[in-house]
Amino acid sequence: MGRKWTYSLMVEAVRYSLFTVTCDGTTKERTESNEMKSSILFTKSKVFALRIVRLYKHLRERKESVIAKQMLRSGTSIGANIAESRYAQSKTDFASKLQIALKEAAETEYWLELLRDSELVESSPAFDSLCGDCTEIIKLLTASVKTAKESV
């Protein structure tokens, strides 16, 4: 009657929890990552993606779409992979999703640098801020991937 079983469940943005559930229906939760940091990462990546979409629209209007399409794909994929990590099937899968998001962020940083260096986009406070946000997301993801891999 007092048998216990466990299962894994992704709860929020990039938060992994283990629940112990008894036969009588009571649960006990153990959180294994920093919920606040995860929420910040998810929010920043979503806001970043929206800014990337706006830049893409601007570039498309100017007929500068080849590099812009690559930037759009990688820039919006960051948040998508972070969102997908919420439903990871294991800690390994969770770490893998974050690693993919990190790779996409690095690719986006490359495309942004290429846009600036090729002078398709003029350096401006808004563009520099976008590049700064990309660097910040890379730093957050690097730390998150390291933590996730250590817990595997």
Predicted regions: what is each one?
Residues 1-80, 84, 88-152:
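Short, C-terminally biased terminal segments at protein or domain edges
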